[in-house]
Each structure stands twice: as structure tokens, then as C-alpha cells.
């Protein structure tokens, strides 16, 4: 019997594991684990496999991958592809960024796993995945013949765009936790908590007219709009932007409001280009595993 391959989606909070047979994810094999319940990824893998032999490993990890190894950004876990292969007896093991894995999944997702938010005017070409969860990152998805090419990125740790219309004092509040003011300081679960804490201090006088939750949402939408607008012109994703992650799903009902669409499309002579970019939300929590299966198919002779 042919050995299955191990697929891994290692996030900052949870890890999903699954098996692929014949190059496709077996949905019945998927299990989710809380990272806090395990001392490290090795113990988690051993608990899942229970000695079962596997052929190969593809893991999407929430952190930068360098020389086949990764230090996760939001949990003190270190992964090394060679060590994973030795641990499991796999012939080969590969680490990619978790947003790369999401990008590799785009052509293999069932239609019901995505919902359109802004229709735009999509044209076949570059696509973009924007992840908003425990952290923040993007992946640009390019077609190369019948294959996909998804380069790594750590865009969530680039600096927030210039936004002079943000409430006075907010940037100073954010800088206390993250002096380099990365995008992730706002557009992530912890970032939302930071905004809510600042709103709760009551120093935002115009915001006192709003419910704290409404004010927090408005500020977050405003930042997201500027970031999405900049990404639209940086990458020209003519085939659209796909949002993923828990924070993205929470904000999705608000993304047709002018508080989001106006700043996102306010790009001067390039407003029409920004307005043509479609936006959709992905609901499938197994997408990264599907993408890991696609990645293995592409690199396996």
C-alpha cells in the first residue's frame, strides 16, 4: 500500500494535521490541536501519527522559513525539515510559510468555500491572499503554465502606511507594544485587542459618541482599507484578493461600507484600478492543508 503524506498547518494558536492520498487531502484525516497543549511540534506529530509510516511532509508554518527551518512568530516553536524527516521516517520534508500554503490552495478549493464581498471587475492574472488572524501576512499567487508560484513574504511586519486621519494618540499607543509599528500591530487578533484597549481609555474624544465596539471596528476598518488599497497597487491582483483568518471573517460583514471602500479606493488617478479589484472571504479551515498537498504534487517528480 502506498504511504500517505503528512500535511501540516502550524499557526500561532492551533495546528491542523491531515494526510494526503494520491496527491489530495483526505478530509476525514484532519485533526486540530491547540498548540498550548503540546510542548512542541514533535510531540504533536507523534500523537497524531502514532507510528504510522509516511512518504513525505509538507508544512505551512506561521513564520519565515530560512534554509529549511522556521522559528514561529507567535509561539516559541522551532521546526527543521531534516529533523521532521528523521522523526517520522519520511523520505522528504518541506516547510513553507502558512500564507504560501493558502495561496497554493486557490485552484483546488470548492466553490462553496468562498463568498464574494466586492465583485470588482476581475481579469485572469495575479491573485493575492491576505491573512488576518493571530498574525498578518500576504501571499501573491502567480500562474506558471499549469502550476502555481507563490513566493514567501512577511508583509505583516512592514510598517503601517501613513494615515494622518487616524485618531490623535493612537499611533503612540501602538508604538508602546511594537515600536516599529508593523501592519500586524493593528491587523491581527492581538492588534484588535490593542485598539479596543486604547478606545476603552476614553482619550479619543470624537469616538466617545460611539459604542466602544463600533469605534474599534471603524478604526480597524480604516487601517485595513489603507493596507488593502496599497496592496492593490503594489501587486495589481487583477484576479482578486482573498481574505482568510478569524479577524477577516469578523470584519467581512463591514467591508461593503463606505468606511472601508472609500479609503481603499482613494488612489488618485488610479482609483479605477483599485476599484476593479474584487474581494472575497475564504471559509475553509483546511485550505492550508489543501495547499500543502498541491505544493507536494508540484515538486514531486
Model-identified regions with their sequence ranges:
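Short acidic-glycine loop/turn motifs at beta-strand connectors
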Residues: 21-24, 68, 142-146
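Active-site nucleophile and cofactor-binding loops and adjacent substrate-binding regions
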Residues: 34-36, 74-75, 94-101, 119-123, ...
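Glycine-rich phosphate-binding loop signature in dinucleotide/nucleotide-binding domains
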Residues: 50-53, 89, 121-124, 235-236
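ATP-binding/phosphotransfer module of carbohydrate and carboxylate kinases, centering on a glycine-rich
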Residues: 1-50, 165-301
Amino acid at each position: 500500500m502506498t504511504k500517505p503524506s503528512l500535511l501540516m498547518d502550524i499557526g500561532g494558536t492551533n495546528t491542523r494535521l491531515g494526510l494526503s492520498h494520491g496527491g489530495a487531502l483526505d478530509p476525514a484525516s484532519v485533526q486540530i490541536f491547540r498548540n498550548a497543549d503540546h510542548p512542541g511540534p514533535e510531540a504533536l506529530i507523534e500523537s497524531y501519527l502514532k507510528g504510522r509510516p509516511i512518504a513525505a511532509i509538507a508544512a505551512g508554518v506561521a513564520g519565515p522559513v530560512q534554509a529549511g527551518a522556521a522559528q514561529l512568530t507567535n509561539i516559541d516553536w522551532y521546526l527543521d525539515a531534516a529533523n521532521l524527516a528523521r522523526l517520522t521516517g519520511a523520505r522528504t520534508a518541506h516547510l513553507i510559510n502558512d500564507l504560501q500554503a493558502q495561496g497554493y490552495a486557490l485552484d483546488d478549493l470548492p466553490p462553496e468555500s468562498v463568498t464574494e464581498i466586492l465583485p470588482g471587475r476581475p481579469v485572469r492574472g495575479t491573485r493575492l491572499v491576505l491573512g488576518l488572524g493571530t498574525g498578518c501576512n500576504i501571499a501573491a499567487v502567480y500562474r506558471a503554465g499549469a502550476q502555481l508560484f507563490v513566493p514567501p513574504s512577511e508583509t505583516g511586519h512592514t510598517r503601517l502606511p501613513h494615515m494622518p486621519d487616524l485618531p490623535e494618540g493612537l499611533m503612540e499607543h501602538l508604538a508602546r507594544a511594537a515600536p516599529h509599528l508593523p501592519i500586524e500591530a493593528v491587523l491581527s487578533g492581538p492588534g484588535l485587542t490593542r485598539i479596543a484597549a486604547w478606545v476603552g481609555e476614553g482619550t479619543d474624544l470624537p469616538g466617545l459618541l460611539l459604542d466602544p465596539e463600533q469605534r474599534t471596528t471603524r478604526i480597524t476598518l480604516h487601517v485595513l482599507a489603507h493596507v488593502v488599497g496599497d496592496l492593490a497597487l503594489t501587486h495589481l491582483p487583477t484576479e482578486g484578493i482573498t481574505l482568510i483568518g478569524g479577524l477577516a471573517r469578523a470584519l467581512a460583514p463591514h467591508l461593503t461600507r463606505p468606511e472601508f471602500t472609500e479609503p481603499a479606493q482613494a488612489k488618485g488617478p488610479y482609483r479605477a484600478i483599485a476599484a476593479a479589484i474584487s474581494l472575497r472571504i475564504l471559509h475553509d479551515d483546511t485550505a492550508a492543508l489543501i495547499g500543502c498537498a498541491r505544493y507536494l504534487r508540484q515538486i514531486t517528480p
